[in-house]
Amino acid sequence: MSQRTEHNGSWLRNAGSLLSVLACVAVLASPASATPASAAAAAAPRTDDYLKRAERILKFTPLIDGHNDLPNFIRKTTKNQIYEGKIPFEDELPGHTDLKRLRKGRVGGQFWSVYTPCPDPPVPIDNPTWSVRDTLEQIDVTKRLIEKYSRDLQFCGDARCARRAFRRGKIASFLGIEGGHQIGNSLGDLRRVYELGVRYITVTHNCDNAFATAQSTVADGLPDTGLMKPFGIEFVKEMNRLGMLVDLSHVSANTMRDTLKVARAPVIFSHSSAYAVSNHLRNVPDDVLKEVAKNNGVVMVTFVSRFVNVENPDAADINTVVDHIFHIAKVAGWDHVGIGGDYDGTVYLPKGLEDVSKYPHLIARVLERGATTQQVRKLVGENILRVWTEVERIAKRLQKTELPNEAYWEGRNWTRPAKRDLNADFEGRSVPLFTSASNGDFCD
């Protein structure tokens, strides 16, 4: 064999070896030969992918939050003065909510809470307070804020308006009252605030009233007497007749149960979570969740750290809230869960949900946990809109056969005497204007 032939044969042998090595490398690099772990990692969607999915859903489905306390923030910080730059709503406010962050959070609709606190110290139910006056002021400032920023916000009083506003690129804005004390325990005042645009009333806040027992009463070790009878029942009936959403956040467990027995329309929990996940009395027990499903209502999950993780509020994070969402969906069904953050109503929020800009991140986590697009659409807005539409439909039917309810609290004093004697000088004689016979019961 010549030197050249030997050299060529050596080259061919080396080339064949090189090709064999390259073939092995190609086989090892192919998907079929990849390890299960590496294949799963390559196929698994990234967090960014879930966030993009969440953004797409919120582009076509309005995210409607059940409870935001921005009006109370305005009351406390500016005494309800919103003009001349006192509330730069288009910029970043110190609290949790402003236009910039609402837009970033893809908010499509918001129930603004026109909250005023329970009397402190507590007073007898029939004692006069400033609660009704303060409530009217909160309605006023909220409507003025909506009007001032009408390029971005639209005041709405029904579910159809909410959808129209969303299609126009505006944030639909609704009003909710947080406690029966705010209407003076009066069905007449209930009707008046409905006329002003209020569309839900929380039956109690953190105080009992003439309608029902609050969870705070039970937390103080007092009996859970539930819905007051008969006046509380008449209150619920009149709310149903009006088309006012009955909100059961803040009420005691027996008030929840009693109300669900007598309600003629779906109820809501505007900002409550699951008691089985975190056993705080502000949350909803499983037996009540099952009744909410039968009632066709909705529980809108709140974010308050001490409610969603009663054992260790500091450890609460975005996944804790997802736990509550999935528990309610498991017990009541995906048709009966929503979102009610309680922004600007607390200073204690879970990590990852620090302000209203974080909703897409929450929805991304819900998708990552395994929820379908349709389930998420129900969660963010379709459920509360369905409930509201049904409440309106039932109200129209009831109004055809029922007159406004004239019930009143049995303990009410209808002839409240003046606190001081006002004397009038009549023909030179001092004559008592209010006598024991009249008891001050006239209005000349």
From Swiss-Prot:
Q: Per its record, what are the GO molecular function terms?
A: metal ion binding; metallodipeptidase activity
Broad EC category: hydrolase
Q: Where does substrate bind?
A: H205, R282, D342
Has keyword Cytoplasm?
A: no
CDD domains attached here?
Answer: rDP_like (cd01301)
Keyword vocabulary terms for this entry = Dipeptidase, Disulfide bond, Glycoprotein, Hydrolase, Metal-binding, Metalloprotease, Protease, Signal, Zinc
Could you tell me which cysteines form disulfide bridges? Answer: C118-C207
Pfam families per record: Peptidase_M19
Carbohydrate-modified residues are N413
Task: Give its E.C. classification number.
Answer: 3.4.13.19
For whether the record's keyword set contains Protease, the answer is yes
What residues bind Zn(2+) 2, as annotated?
A: E178, H250, H271
What does it catalyze? an L-aminoacyl-L-amino acid + H2O = 2 an L-alpha-amino acid
Superkingdom, according to UniProt? Eukaryota
Q: Report the leader peptide range.
A: 1-34
Record's function text: Hydrolyzes a wide range of dipeptides.
- Record's protein name: Putative dipeptidase CPC735_015490
| Naturally occurring in which organism (per UniProt) | Coccidioides posadasii (strain C735) (Valley fever fungus)
